[in-house]
Every structure is written in structure tokens, then in C-alpha cells.
Amino acid sequence: MTVSQVRRVAVIGAGISGVVSTAHLVAAGFEVTVFERNQQTGGICINRPCYKNLTTNVSTPLMRIKLRAWPENTPDFVHHSVVNEYIRDIALSTGVDERTIYGARVEHVYKDGGKWHVNWSVLDDNGSIDGLEERRLISTFDAVVVASGHYHSPHIPDIPGLSEVKKRWPSRVIHSKRYRTPEVYRDENVLMIGGGVSSMDISRDLGPFAKMIFQSTRNGDADPPALMLPDNADANDTILVTNGTQVHNIHRDIFYIPDPTLAFVGIPYFNTTFTLFEFQAIAVTAVWSRTACLPSTTEMRREYLVKQKQTGGGRKFHSLKDKEKEYVRDLMAWINDGRNAHGLVPIEGHTAAWFEAMDKLWDEARAAMKERKEQQEKIIKRIPFSADCTSVELPHLN
């Protein structure tokens, strides 16, 4: 199966990356089926995957997509329920909702005989006492978009001793993905492993409730200045792992090099998410509708290896920190070269309003970061990792 033969497409996930991917593919005439394990669109922005007080840390002008503007007078920073409603409105207005199978669990995706096979299951009401019966199905497609995002599978760092603690006290070690409300940590000592945005936001959320908060990190991307661990600060009641997650052989963080009928939308991090993911969805649509041409497999592989060397590989391969503007500029230039060749109107990349909002965000972020650091230093004691980040020891639990 080549990209010139793509017609039927499976999209896995109905968060923002799945919704915008489906919307653009449908507009281009593709037959799309969306598999969503939850009962509604929204991804991480629906109530169950989010912690109660989660608000956006990227302003709504930066998250505006081409398919739909935010409602008039929407604040710059909003509760996750507002974001979920925005995604839901997009899904309803673009035909995504009617093409989505809700409650569908995708269990296996593989290619055989030139077709992609999606093994999935759904629970049906069979009218019996038990009520529900699992129905397993296999559907075939020409191409697949994996739009489950980079928040779906939590990354647990390989720290000696951590897994043993988790086995012995399962409720005392959780990933930030499982964090919901701060009240359950009232009067507890909490150790945060990781120094990124999740760690900072959850620490602030825990501040009024936890007895003490300790943060263990090595060169976190959002680290405030570290404080030395006090002598009596080795006892912790709960460990929160806030490290991020970590795809190999992909071109432009989108196309699987050995077979570009498999695409990923929503993998990069340290970006403005919604707009970035829509540009990726536009790229997928352009390639599969043959208005944009991918380089040869050899050239894609060469570019991949160059980037691998530049970033050091691993999770940082997908980081767009200080690179988003360049990434989108290059992506849209490539897409528009193809559109020009086909006599199509070019698609605008980042708008003037987006750049204005980005400049405003950076000014506000610097001020907010200063304030947040001051707040955190009042509630967090920081444990500086050694260079090799070797272990976590909880003597009082032995």
C-alpha cells in the first residue's frame, strides 16, 4: 500500500489531535473511522483523566485552530472543562463525532496483505444479569493515524529501589497522570520525582494541604533554584513520579519512515499543542491526498539520524522547546510548495495574532515564573540529584 492508494483511514484517539486529524481528512474526502476508548471526545481534557484544578498553561489565542475560533470573550487561561467543550464543538461541527466509535478499545494494530488491521473491542449491553458483553472485532484500513497523544502512557524512570517500594506500598507511589485532588494528601509528606511543568503545577496544587513537599530532580526544564535537603527530611508518605513520556523512525515527528501510511499526530512536546497538532494533521492530509510529496526513504532516514545525533535521541528527540516557530515554518513551506505545484491556495502558518500572543505569553511567563518560584520555595524542599541519579531510599519504610 502506497500513499497514492489511501482512502479508508483509522484514527486512534478523539482528543484534540484525533479530532483535527479527522476533520481535515474528512474535508479532503477520506473515509475515516475514529476509535475512542472514552464515551466522549476531549482526550486528557475530560474530567476523569484530569486533576480537578487543572487549567491551561498555554493561552487560548495560541491554542486557536483554523477550524473554529474560541467563543468571544474567552479568557486567556481557562479550566480544562472549557477546553473540553471547545474540542467537543469542533467534533460536532466538522462531522468527527458521527464518525467516532466511543467506548472502543484498540488492542492491536498490524499490517498484513497491504492493509492495516485494527483489532478492537467494545462492551455491549446484552440484556443479561451481568449487563455487559465484550465484542471483539477486526477492521481494515489503508492508513492509520495514531492520535493518542504523548500523555497516554506514563514514563516511569528506572530508579533502583522505586519499583520495590511500589510493590510493597502500591498506594504510596503514583504517576502524575493518576493525580486528581490535593485533599487526599492532607498532612502527608510528598516526594515529587521530576522537575517539569507537571511537577511545578501539582506542587502548587498540593501546597495548602501537604505537610511537606520535597522535589527530587536533575536539571528539570522548569526548575526553580534548588535548596539543600534539611537533616530531618528523609521521611516521605507519598511519592509522585512526574517524569514525562518517550517513537522511532519517524519523519518530521509525523510519518513512519518504513511505511508512511502510518502517521502520528500529537507526539511533540514543549509547544502550543492545538495549533501545532493541526499543522501536523494538515501535513498528513496533504501527503495522503498527494498534494505534498515525502522525500525518499533514504533521505528521510538520513534526516532522522541527523536529528537523532543533534538531540541525543530519547524523549528529547520530540522536544520543540525554542523550535516550534522554525518547525511550523519549514512544515508549511514544504506543504505549500506542493499546493503551489497543484494550483492550490497556500495555507497560512502561524498568524500575526499567534506571534503577538506568543510574545505576550513570554512576557507574562517570565513574571509568572518568578512568582511561582517564590511560592514554591515556601512549600518545597528540593533534593538535588547526583549526576547519575542513582536511587531513592526511604529508610522509615524498611
Swiss-Prot record:
Pfam families, from UniProt? Answer: FMO-like
How far does the signal peptide extend, from start to end residue?
1-22
Glycan attachment sites: 53, 57, 119, 126, 236, 243, 271
Where is NADP(+) bound in this sequence? Answer: 194-199
The family database entries (Gene3D superfamilies) matched by this protein are listed as:
FAD/NAD(P)-binding domain (3.50.50.60)
- What phenotype is described for loss of this gene? Impairs the production of ustiloxin B but accumulates intermediates such as ustiloxin F and C.
Binding annotation for FAD:
13-18
The record's section on PANTHER family has: DIMETHYLANILINE MONOOXYGENASE
Q: Per its record, how is this protein called by name?
A: Flavin-containing monooxygenase ustF1
Q: Which organism is it from?
A: Aspergillus flavus (strain ATCC 200026 / FGSC A1120 / IAM 13836 / NRRL 3357 / JCM 12722 / SRRC 167)
